[in-house]
């Protein structure tokens, strides 16, 4: 099989990379009705599989789970989760032939085996759904021409998909129809109904493409979302300890610092995050972020280039074929780092202390978010897609580090994201070491003293922060989500 993206001509590639339209609430007036009365069979019962299924069932859809025979016979975790939640569970042979929509929510590396197993069992004219398009775009999986292929991709972990639904809301979602597989022209109707059934229509839906979703998703998770947080955690911890900071305090400042800092990012973008600093600290954070962007730009561009060309995917799939040797080695090495093995700090760190003593961390967040966004947009990805795959998801990933450090982040994210994270962080750490060595007092671990600032300089920095394209599109999208939530709560 050939990488699907690489079979397209340049015009087709650009058209699919640039496909992104914010859909109006009125386009979901019919809710999930298009799928009501039809049989939806989910393959896989992990975080996305279970939580999407719960939402879809609560939206009135007929949901069951198809699992491998051995998973059922051995009563594995997937079987237990599905049965404990009252779902019908059966083998592929028992459930797939009756399905109107088969939703493949297994890990990326299992997609080819799953699709090759279910395709012969699917009835003529059925639909196949994904929540990530890697199998279609990067693997180049060939799907029978009578089958409609759609995607509904919530921009949050599965647990958040469920919690937001229970609150009467949802999470921002991308939907797409594979242009090679829409024989009856019903793909968009299926995708819209599926998105509505998960609650995504209440938070905002982008009509996208499989290509745009995959390329932007890979870029975001490799760089700012996971790779930058891992590299930043390791570098900042080692710097603090080398300068005499108690390892336990240093660990807590970093572990919970990312979450605290990005909560401001979530509420008001880079502007609010930077506004949490004193004026002297803001100017310093801005200067550091500009230096970081200059240093890291070639690395971000290399990751984007390798994602666009398929070089990243081919390398990762080679590691799949080699029993994940690289992935497992990197995972083990990460677990042995000083940050991961540091003792816990029992004292309290106040919220503002994370900002005051984390100027470098804030600069890293700003630089990473802006670089990821800029690099995606320069590659033809529309700004809204780039926003969701950079700034929007960052607080969610930071929250995983707050739970159990980098271990938790790498457990929660997909193996695809974890592999890309290691590629980036292993390159980024040595790249930034000379920069880290030149830091000044107050950049990390201690506060920058209050003092006079130049008004014109502060004005120009504030203007530069607020006028960045990601702040403009972010303000629009966050405002839309707030409006949608207000409407949803009002009923």
From Swiss-Prot:
EC number(s) per entry: 1.1.1.86
Binding site for substrate: 414
Any one GO MF annotation of this record: ketol-acid reductoisomerase activity
Cellular-component GO terms for this entry: cytosol
Chain positions recorded as NADP(+) binding sites: 45-48, 68, 76, 78, 108-110, 158
Keyword presence, Membrane: no
SUPFAM superfamilies: 6-phosphogluconate dehydrogenase C-terminal domain-like (SSF48179), NAD(P)-binding Rossmann-fold domains (SSF51735)
Reaction equations catalysed: (2R)-2,3-dihydroxy-3-methylbutanoate + NADP(+) = (2S)-2-acetolactate + NADPH + H(+); (2R,3R)-2,3-dihydroxy-3-methylpentanoate + NADP(+) = (S)-2-ethyl-2-hydroxy-3-oxobutanoate + NADPH + H(+)
Cofactor comment text: Binds 2 magnesium ions per subunit.
CC cofactor: Mg(2+)
Binding annotation for Mg(2+) 2: 217, 389, 393
UniProt domain KARI N-terminal Rossmann: residue ranges: 15-208
Binding site for Mg(2+) 1: 217, 221
GO BP terms: isoleucine biosynthetic process; L-valine biosynthetic process
Active site: 132
Domain KARI C-terminal knotted: 209-344, 345-484
UniProt pathway: Amino-acid biosynthesis; L-isoleucine biosynthesis; L-isoleucine from 2-oxobutanoate: step 2/4; Amino-acid biosynthesis; L-valine biosynthesis; L-valine from pyruvate: step 2/4
Keywords on record: Amino-acid biosynthesis, Branched-chain amino acid biosynthesis, Magnesium, Metal-binding, NADP, Oxidoreductase, Repeat
Family assignment from sequence similarity: Belongs to the ketol-acid reductoisomerase family.
NCBIfam families listed in its UniProt record: ilvC (TIGR00465), PRK05225.1 (NF003557)
Primary role: Involved in the biosynthesis of branched-chain amino acids (BCAA). Catalyzes an alkyl-migration followed by a ketol-acid reduction of (S)-2-acetolactate (S2AL) to yield (R)-2,3-dihydroxy-isovalerate. In the isomerase reaction, S2AL is rearranged via a Mg-dependent methyl migration to produce 3-hydroxy-3-methyl-2-ketobutyrate (HMKB). In the reductase reaction, this 2-ketoacid undergoes a metal-dependent reduction by NADPH to yield (R)-2,3-dihydroxy-isovalerate.
Protein name: Ketol-acid reductoisomerase (NADP(+))
Naturally occurring in which organism (per UniProt): Salmonella agona (strain SL483)
Gene symbol of the encoding locus: ilvC
């Amino acid at each position: 099989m050939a990488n699907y993206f690489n079979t397209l001509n340049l015009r087709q590639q650009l058209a699919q990379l640039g496909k992104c339209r914010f859909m109006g609430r009125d386009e979901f007036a019919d809710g999930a009705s298009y799928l009501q009365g039809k049989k939806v069979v989910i393959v896989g019962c992990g975080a996305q599989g279970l939580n999407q299924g719960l939402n879809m069932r609560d939206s009135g859809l007929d949901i069951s789970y198809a699992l491998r025979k051995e998973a059922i016979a051995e009563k594995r975790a997937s079987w237990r989760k599905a049965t404990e939640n009252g779902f019908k569970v059966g083998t592929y042979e028992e459930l797939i032939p009756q399905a109107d929509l088969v939703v493949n929510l297994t890990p990326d590396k299992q997609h080819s085996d799953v699709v090759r197993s279910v395709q012969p069992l699917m009835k003529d004219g059925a639909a196949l759904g994904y929540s990530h398009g890697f199998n279609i775009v990067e693997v180049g999986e060939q799907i029978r021409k009578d089958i409609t292929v759609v995607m509904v991709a919530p921009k949050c972990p599965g647990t958040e998909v469920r919690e937001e639904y229970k609150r009467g809301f949802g999470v921002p979602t991308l939907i797409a129809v594979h242009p090679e597989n829409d024989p009856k022209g019903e793909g968009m109707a299926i995708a819209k109904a599926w998105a509505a059934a998960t609650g995504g229509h209440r938070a905002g839906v982008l009509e996208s493409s499989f290509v745009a979703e995959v390329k932007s998703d890979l870029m975001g998770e490799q760089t700012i979302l996971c790779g930058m947080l891992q590299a930043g955690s390791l570098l900042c911890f080692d710097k603090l300890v080398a300068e005499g900071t108690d390892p336990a305090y240093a660990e807590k400042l970093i572990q919970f610092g990312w979450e605290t800092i990005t909560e401001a990012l979530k509420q008001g973008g880079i502007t609010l995050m930077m506004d949490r600093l004193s004026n002297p600290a803001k100017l310093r954070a801005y200067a550091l972020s500009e230096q970081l962007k200059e240093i890291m730009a070639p690395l971000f561009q290399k990751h984007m280039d390798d994602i666009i060309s398929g070089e990243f995917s081919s390398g990762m799939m080679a590691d799949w074929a080699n029993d994940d040797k690289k992935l497992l080695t990197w995972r083990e090495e990460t677990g042995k780092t000083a940050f991961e093995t540091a003792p816990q700090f029992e004292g309290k760190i106040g919220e503002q202390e994370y900002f005051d003593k984390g100027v470098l961390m804030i600069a890293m967040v700003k630089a990473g978010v802006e670089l990821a966004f800029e690099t995606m947009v320069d590659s033809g990805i529309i700004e809204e897609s780039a926003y969701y795959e950079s700034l929007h998801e960052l607080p969610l990933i930071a929250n995983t580090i707050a739970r159990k450090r980098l271990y938790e982040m790498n457990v929660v994210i997909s193996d695809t994201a974890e592999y890309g994270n290691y590629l980036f962080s292993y390159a980024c750490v040595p790249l930034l070491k000379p920069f880290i060595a030149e830091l000044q007092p107050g950049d990390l671990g201690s506060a920058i003293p209050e003092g006079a600032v130049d008004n014109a300089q502060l004005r120009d920095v504030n203007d530069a922060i607020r006028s960045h394209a990601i702040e403009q599109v972010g303000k629009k999208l966050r405002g839309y989500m707030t409006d949608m939530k207000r409407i949803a709560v009002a009923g």
